[in-house]
Amino acid sequence: MSVKGITPQELAAYGIHNVSEIVYNPSYDLLFEEETKPTLEGYERGTLTTTGAIAVDTGIFTGRSPKDKYIVRDAITQDTVWWADQGKGKNDNKPLSQEIWSHLKGLVTEQLSGKRLFVVDTFCGANADTRLQVRFITEVAWQAHFVKNMFIRPSDEELARFEPDFIVMNGAKCTNPQWKEQGLNSENFVAFNLTERMQLIGGTWYGGEMKKGMFSMMNYLLPLKGIASMHCSANVGEKGDVAIFFGLSGTGKTTLSTDPKRKLIGDDEHGWDDDGVFNFEGGCYAKTIKLSEEAEPDIYHAIKRDALLENVVVLADGTVDFNDGSKTENTRVSYPIYHIDNIVKPVSKAGHATKVIFLTADAFGVLPPVSRLTANQTQYHFLSGFTAKLAGTERGVTEPTPTFSACFGAAFLSLHPTQYAEVLVKRMQAVGAQAYLVNTGWNGTGKRISIKDTRAIIDAILNGEIDKAETFTLPIFDLAVPMSLPGVNPDILDPRDTYADKAQWQEKAEDLAKRFATNFDKYTDTPAGAALVSAGPKI
């Protein structure tokens, strides 16, 4: 425990009164004791598993609740936030009045008043000059444990000087009974006020609301300073060469950035400033459904004492059944980043990225396994954020489902997507970085591109072999595709060659091109977006 602590007067400034005790920056050992107290009930209670990690349940909320997300619309945010009720793009940034904010704040502070509270002071962002100093206040021990795992843990010296830039008050036990009259989505809420620099949580116990809440705030603050804010993983090679991997769920972002030859900077949220790429977090929040030691040894071995499992099935003898998704498919574990051996130390940051990789899993069988992108194509495909999944595993015809998520993370964008694309490309151009589109999905044979071929493609990108390769231009999408790469099956590089009849590829390509164009239409309401249409597929 730190010597400084926090006084009841400081909590009173936030509207929290008559606190019975403040547990400030508890140690992992104290949190372990607190979470496993036999007197705890319901979702507060943690269960010790044979892995050494504690398991908790989050009730009906086993994922984020985007429909309950609000941002106060005021003089600061009016003209900067990408609002849900403006423009053609759909997003989760619903406006909230100052009046309703005050009501919600009253509900949360009333819930936390008179209680024994956990207060955890953390950093969000590994760079001292741009990081947020975030103070989390909760009455639930495991929620304090979650943020201790996921955010950067200050030293005692840093805690002595700690002045919070942002306050998160988690009132998971309280709900808003007046939601209907106020025109809100439900009794639950995740609300932000950028003038007060505060987040309020009510009704949902899901830990990820605290993690992604601060990501949304970094996504607001950093691009306005010219710093890229990215939903990506990042690693660094022995020579200091940095690569960043963007991709939606299921595209291989975590798997492909975990490489024995390279050190991990982080697995999910990063910034890119004048010094280079830096992690926002001090931990990892990994999916655990169907987790096995063989497939993902790093994550498997990170699940030990101090890790926190969410919504997994724990058997009577304390063992965890990672294959059981009966509570949710979104089972998770949070752990401090040092539970992974091969990481950048002591601070999760490195130099400028020279390789930017967009991962997509194309179930339409159209895109090549890899292509080099021009600067405009980089912005176009970044804004499109495309992936697709097969609708089912039954035999016979399966209709692929396309997903377009701006900047490979639309749910967390607080500004218009074109602002992120512009900042990213400026950062790339300043250091001569190159972007590549890597398809980890399916080809005309109906088979998924093998992990062996994909790893060889990533190796060719990272060691520069791909830049020496002769290329051809794939029609419609106008992509520069290498004719051969070391260790990669040459028969798969041109997706047209994986079809018995090339006319089949042409038909599917035209269909997918139309879907890209329809999706991109929402960006044409800004000059920056309209200028990029020509970088997309030609129908």
UniProtKB/Swiss-Prot annotation:
Involved in the gluconeogenesis. Catalyzes the conversion of oxaloacetate (OAA) to phosphoenolpyruvate (PEP) through direct phosphoryl transfer between the nucleoside triphosphate and OAA. ATP binds at residues 212, 231, 247-255, 296, 332, 448-449, 454. It comes from the Bacteria. Keywords: ATP-binding, Cytoplasm, Decarboxylase, Gluconeogenesis, Lyase, Manganese, Metal-binding, Nucleotide-binding. This is Phosphoenolpyruvate carboxykinase (ATP). SUPFAM superfamilies: PEP carboxykinase N-terminal domain, PEP carboxykinase-like. One of its GO terms (cellular component) is cytosol. Its EC number is 4.1.1.49. The keyword DNA-binding does not apply. Belongs to the phosphoenolpyruvate carboxykinase (ATP) family. GO terms for molecular function: ATP binding; metal ion binding; phosphoenolpyruvate carboxykinase (ATP) activity. Its cofactor is Mn(2+). Its main location: cytoplasm. Monomer. It is found in: Cytoplasm. Pathway: Carbohydrate biosynthesis; gluconeogenesis. Mn(2+) binds at residues 212, 231, 268. It catalyses: oxaloacetate + ATP = phosphoenolpyruvate + ADP + CO2. GO terms for biological process: gluconeogenesis. PANTHER family: PHOSPHOENOLPYRUVATE CARBOXYKINASE (ATP) (PTHR30031:SF0), PHOSPHOENOLPYRUVATE CARBOXYKINASE ATP (PTHR30031). Substrate binds at residues 64, 206, 212, 332. Binds 1 Mn(2+) ion per subunit.
